[in-house]
Amino acid sequence: LHYDVMDGHFVPNISFGAPVLECLHKALPEVFYDVHLMISHPLQYAEPFIKAGASLYNFHLECEDDIQQTIDAVKALGCKVGLTIKPGTAPEALEPYLDQLDLVLVMSVEPGFGGQKFMPSALDKLRWLKAEKDRRGLKFLLEVDGGVDAATAPQCVAAGADVLVAGSAIFGAADPAAAVRAMAAL
């Protein structure tokens, strides 16, 4: 389950916190919780979210905290770690951290609002990251989020994406279960 966290500062919207995640985790402990933190200071929230049930703590390269210190803190808490890049950030900026990551998320829209149109430039980023992953023998998963639908999902998979985040395409579909099945079949 991709769980978006927004602080009203890094992005304009505000969403769920650690207490809601804790309730979800208690009700559905078998679910993998990919916690995507669109927040300015992910370091200070690592422990509360991981204790609440985060399976993967996924924060933005563009945050205000020290990236290495945050990665180290998440790993010390026994959690998988991911880094996310916004549409305006080059994938090469992730190079110093790639060998420490369990997941890299490429945003294909500006973070903070659902229902936006997919930015095709994300495909080049996915291709570069997939090539770098293969060249270096790394194991991180590649995830894409934003504007992913029946038309863009196959392009993302072809570019190297392992994980697709599709909110509006699923929850706005006449038959959400069929939309999930169609994407899972890719």
Model features per residue range: what roles?
Residues 1-20, 61, 109-117:
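Glycine-rich, proline-tolerant flexible connector loops at the mouths of alpha/beta enzymes
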Residues 4, 49, 104, 129, ...:
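Conserved, mostly hydrophobic/aromatic
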Residues 6-8, 38-42, 62-64, 86-88, ...:
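Active-site beta-loop-alpha junctions enriched in small/polar residues
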Residues 9-42, 46, 153-170:
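A short alpha/beta connector and helix-capping loop motif
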Residues 14-35, 73-84, 122-142, 146, ...:
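Alpha-helix-loop-beta-strand connector modules within alpha/beta enzyme cores
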Residues 43-51, 89-101, 146-164:
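Catalytic cores of alpha/beta
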Residues 44-45, 54-141:
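Conserved anion-binding
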Residues 157, 169-186:
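C-terminal helical cap(s) of enzyme catalytic domains, especially alpha/beta-barrels
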